[in-house]
């Protein structure tokens, strides 16, 4: 974490359980981020918190620290059964649930509290086997949680801590009925520590907090601008015919260490993947059609640096906690203004700088005025020389279901192609 992203407040300054502090410091966490410095005094005092902060600002560690401290400091109910978790953390996507679980593992190892993971797509029996042995903290997506609850594999009657992460995304994906179903099976709000975190605290999110929390305190960490002041934004106006060639030329020029390319449809993502894979880039594809095991493998390879480029739809734009993403390319300008912010928020995280490059083609340029109005500024425009675009490109690969989602990146230096402007 960059020091510029941290406050002077130290975790050790709080009356946190010693095992929690030890686990944090072992992972190199000494100073709090702004959202952690605001939320922890409240949760340690037993107050409910509804927090707003940009992605990448430490929200996850804020609620994990609070959850582990609370469970270590408050005994479980006397007649708690093996199928009754003590804490429930709900996430909108399986990728986010998996990442929260990974972030929680060092704390679990240090404290002895047991973790469980529940998400749809695959792994039903494997997840169930862990639950049957008893877990303290259950992390999951609402659909799989309801499946387990309806079959009495889990019982929510002993819940002491509830976390709702990416609450605005829960609404976007239509999970609000599922959330309310789960809340109705828990002890009353006054008998739990409740935490809600969201990129935006809209009216509907505040309404949910009013319904399901106990006089929650609202804490907000507002960025200087919605897109983050450490992100360099850049805009090009390519023709439809030059768009793919421009993208590949920019990639050769920028030679990003770790980049995510967003497009508006899965078919467009597959097309981009095919061009880049054929050109020798180490590229992965992440869309709703990719099988769950493969999705997790691709994310792991991208996080480890085995892949340099990830091509993704907006289904993957929220909740990806991947460090050191240097570049985000908006191959298509999104139809939803918030998606622009969420997309480019994958870079420039935790105090680092980042570069966002958007292509306003003939098909999606009409989305630009609304995006610029939403973010409160114009995106700087750059020009390019059409004659300098790459044109000796191999025929794109066509995706087959048996083909892996990456290809070897070509060895050697990037091509020496420069744009004008």
Curated annotation (Swiss-Prot):
<feature type="region of interest" description="Disordered">
    <location>
        <begin position="396"/>
        <end position="421"/>
    </location>
</feature>
<keyword id="KW-0067">ATP-binding</keyword>
<dbReference type="InterPro" id="IPR050079">
    <property type="entry name" value="DEAD_box_RNA_helicase"/>
</dbReference>
<keyword id="KW-0347">Helicase</keyword>
<keyword id="KW-0378">Hydrolase</keyword>
<feature type="compositionally biased region" description="Low complexity">
    <location>
        <begin position="402"/>
        <end position="414"/>
    </location>
</feature>
<dbReference type="GO" id="GO:0003724">
    <property type="term" value="F:RNA helicase activity"/>
</dbReference>
<comment type="similarity">
    <text>Belongs to the DEAD box helicase family. RhlB subfamily.</text>
</comment>
<protein>
    <recommendedName>
        <fullName>ATP-dependent RNA helicase RhlB</fullName>
        <ecNumber>3.6.4.13</ecNumber>
    </recommendedName>
</protein>
<dbReference type="InterPro" id="IPR014014">
    <property type="entry name" value="RNA_helicase_DEAD_Q_motif"/>
</dbReference>
<dbReference type="InterPro" id="IPR001650">
    <property type="entry name" value="Helicase_C-like"/>
</dbReference>
<dbReference type="InterPro" id="IPR023554">
    <property type="entry name" value="RNA_helicase_ATP-dep_RhlB"/>
</dbReference>
<keyword id="KW-0694">RNA-binding</keyword>
<dbReference type="Pfam" id="PF00271">
    <property type="entry name" value="Helicase_C"/>
</dbReference>
<dbReference type="GO" id="GO:0016887">
    <property type="term" value="F:ATP hydrolysis activity"/>
</dbReference>
<dbReference type="InterPro" id="IPR011545">
    <property type="entry name" value="DEAD/DEAH_box_helicase_dom"/>
</dbReference>
<dbReference type="GO" id="GO:0005524">
    <property type="term" value="F:ATP binding"/>
</dbReference>
<dbReference type="GO" id="GO:0003723">
    <property type="term" value="F:RNA binding"/>
</dbReference>
<feature type="domain" description="Helicase ATP-binding">
    <location>
        <begin position="40"/>
        <end position="219"/>
    </location>
</feature>
<comment type="subunit">
    <text>Component of the RNA degradosome, which is a multiprotein complex involved in RNA processing and mRNA degradation.</text>
</comment>
<dbReference type="Pfam" id="PF00270">
    <property type="entry name" value="DEAD"/>
</dbReference>
<feature type="binding site">
    <location>
        <begin position="53"/>
        <end position="60"/>
    </location>
    <ligand>
        <name>ATP</name>
    </ligand>
</feature>
<comment type="function">
    <text>DEAD-box RNA helicase involved in RNA degradation. Has RNA-dependent ATPase activity and unwinds double-stranded RNA.</text>
</comment>
<feature type="short sequence motif" description="Q motif">
    <location>
        <begin position="9"/>
        <end position="37"/>
    </location>
</feature>
<dbReference type="GO" id="GO:0006401">
    <property type="term" value="P:RNA catabolic process"/>
</dbReference>
<keyword id="KW-0963">Cytoplasm</keyword>
<dbReference type="InterPro" id="IPR027417">
    <property type="entry name" value="P-loop_NTPase"/>
</dbReference>
<dbReference type="InterPro" id="IPR014001">
    <property type="entry name" value="Helicase_ATP-bd"/>
</dbReference>
<dbReference type="GO" id="GO:0005829">
    <property type="term" value="C:cytosol"/>
</dbReference>
<keyword id="KW-0547">Nucleotide-binding</keyword>
<feature type="short sequence motif" description="DEAD box">
    <location>
        <begin position="165"/>
        <end position="168"/>
    </location>
</feature>
<dbReference type="InterPro" id="IPR000629">
    <property type="entry name" value="RNA-helicase_DEAD-box_CS"/>
</dbReference>
<feature type="domain" description="Helicase C-terminal">
    <location>
        <begin position="245"/>
        <end position="390"/>
    </location>
</feature>
């Amino acid at each position: 974490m960059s020091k510029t992203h941290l406050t002077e407040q130290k975790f050790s300054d709080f009356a946190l359980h010693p095992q929690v502090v030890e686990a944090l410091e072992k992972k190199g966490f000494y100073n709090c981020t702004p959202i952690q410095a605001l939320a922890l005094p409240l949760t340690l005092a037993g107050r409910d918190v509804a927090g707003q902060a940009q992605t990448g600002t430490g929200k996850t560690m804020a609620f994990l620290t609070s959850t582990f401290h609370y469970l270590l400091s408050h005994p479980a109910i006397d007649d708690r059964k093996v199928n009754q978790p003590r804490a429930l953390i709900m996430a909108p996507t399986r990728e986010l649930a998996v990442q929260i679980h990974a972030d929680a593992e060092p704390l679990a190892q240090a404290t002895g509290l047991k973790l469980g993971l529940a998400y749809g797509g695959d792994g039903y029996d494997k997840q169930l086997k862990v639950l049957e042995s008893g877990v303290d903290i259950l992390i999951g997506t609402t659909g799989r949680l309801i499946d387990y609850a309806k079959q009495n594999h889990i019982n929510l009657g002993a819940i002491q801590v509830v976390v709702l992460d990416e609450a605005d995304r829960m609404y976007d994906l239509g999970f609000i009925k599922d959330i309310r179903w789960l809340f109705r099976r828990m002890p009353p709000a006054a008998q739990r520590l409740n935490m809600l975190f969201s990129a935006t605290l809209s009216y509907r999110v505040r309404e949910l907090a009013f319904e399901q929390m106990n006089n929650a305190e609202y804490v907000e960490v507002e960025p200087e601008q919605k897109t983050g002041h450490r992100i360099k934004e850049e805009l090009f106006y390519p023709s439809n015919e030059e768009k793919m060639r421009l993208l590949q030329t920019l990639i050769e020029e920028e030679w990003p260490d770790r980049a995510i390319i967003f497009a508006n449809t899965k078919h467009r993502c597959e097309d981009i993947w095919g061009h880049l894979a054929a050109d020798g880039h180490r590229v992965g594809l992440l869309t709703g059609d990719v099988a769950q095991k493969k999705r997790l493998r691709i994310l792991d390879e991208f996080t480890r640096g085995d892949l340099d480029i990830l091509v993704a739809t907006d289904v993957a734009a929220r909740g990806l906690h991947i460090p050191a993403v240097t570049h985000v390319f908006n191959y298509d300008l999104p139809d939803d203004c918030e998606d622009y912010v969420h997309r480019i928020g994958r870079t420039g995280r935790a105090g680092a700088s980042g570069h966002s490059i958007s292509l306003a083609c003939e098909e999606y340029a009409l989305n630009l005025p609304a995006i610029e109005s939403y973010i409160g500024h114009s995106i700087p425009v750059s020009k390019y020389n059409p004659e300098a675009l790459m044109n000796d490109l191999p025929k794109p690969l066509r995706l087959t279901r048996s083909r892996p989602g990456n290809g070897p990146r070509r060895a050697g230096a990037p091509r020496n192609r420069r744009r004008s402007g």
